[in-house]
């Protein structure tokens, strides 16, 4: 089993999404001691945003300047890591109703025709079928119910884009209302960690 562990929160040791992804991966690792884990910290690593020059770069990168070539290689490596994974664990805090820009930059590197999707006469087809996606979703407010749910462009986007890649087994471990006071924050984190500790993530990745 290969696990790809992605963090994108910018708050370091204060990040709740990081705390939750760590717990998820630890639970998976305890159940599958032989699991191979690849880790990327998108907040501390350089994750180049997609540019036209990168898209137009020749496959062999001949004649391409060093910085552009490095950016293209980073994107290719990220794609290969994703394709190789059986289970993908993503820490996705909600920032301004959406996801961190560095997480979007990573997803842009995965959205490659012929790799994660293709267009057919019957419409688009996802090529990353069979993977499990577990998302540690953290929010300052409550966005899982109306009327605030209309402003959720975080979980809805992630479900849509990874569904487009062919991944239908998607679960969100959610901690929300984190900015509504210390008691609510503690409660939300405890509930999320309880869900993880009860072994639900193992069922997801079985």
Swiss-Prot record:
Keywords for the protein's UniProt record, in alphabetical order: Flavoprotein, FMN, NAD, Oxidoreductase
Reactions performed catalytically: 2 a quinone + NADH + H(+) = 2 a 1,4-benzosemiquinone + NAD(+); N,N-dimethyl-1,4-phenylenediamine + anthranilate + 2 NAD(+) = 2-(4-dimethylaminophenyl)diazenylbenzoate + 2 NADH + 2 H(+)
Record InterPro entries: Flavodoxin_fold, Flavoprotein-like_sf, FMN-dep_NADH:Q_OxRdtase_AzoR1, NADH:quinone_OxRdtase_FMN_depd
Signal peptide residues on this chain, from the entry's feature table: none
Domain of life: Bacteria
Keyword NAD: yes
Broad class of enzyme this protein falls into: oxidoreductase
Keyword Nuclease listed: no
GO molecular function, one term: oxidoreductase activity, acting on NAD(P)H as acceptor
EC numbers: 1.6.5.-, 1.7.1.17
Summary of subunit composition and partner proteins: Homodimer.
Family: Belongs to the azoreductase type 1 family.
Database matches in HAMAP family: Azoreductase_type1 (MF_01216)
Main function: Quinone reductase that provides resistance to thiol-specific stress caused by electrophilic quinones. Also exhibits azoreductase activity. Catalyzes the reductive cleavage of the azo bond in aromatic azo compounds to the corresponding amines.
Name under which the protein is recorded: FMN-dependent NADH:quinone oxidoreductase
Record organism: Rhizobium meliloti (strain 1021)
């Amino acid at each position: 089993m290969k696990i790809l562990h992605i963090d994108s929160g910018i708050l370091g040791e204060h990040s709740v999404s990081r705390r939750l992804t760590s717990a998820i991966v630890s639970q998976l690792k305890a159940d599958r001691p032989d699991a191979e884990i690849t880790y990327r910290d998108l907040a501390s690593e350089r994750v180049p945003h997609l540019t036209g020059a990168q898209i137009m770069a020749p496959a062999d990168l001949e004649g391409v300047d060093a910085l552009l070539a490095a950016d293209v290689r980073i994107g290719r490596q990220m794609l290969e890591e994703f394709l190789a994974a059986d289970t993908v664990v993503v820490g996705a805090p909600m920032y301004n109703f959406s996801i961190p820009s560095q997480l979007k930059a990573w997803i842009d590197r995965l959205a490659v025709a012929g790799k994660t999707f293709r267009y057919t006469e019957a419409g688009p087809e996802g090529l990353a079928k069979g993977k499990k996606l577990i998302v540690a979703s953290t929010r300052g407010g409550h966005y899982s119910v109306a009327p605030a749910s209309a402003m959720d462009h975080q979980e809805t986007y992630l479900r849509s884009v990874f569904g487009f890649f062919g991944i239908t087994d998607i679960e969100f471990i959610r901690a929300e209302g984190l900015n509504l006071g210390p008691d609510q924050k503690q409660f939300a984190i405890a509930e999320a960690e309880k869900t993880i500790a009860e072994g639900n993530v193992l069922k997801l990745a079985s």
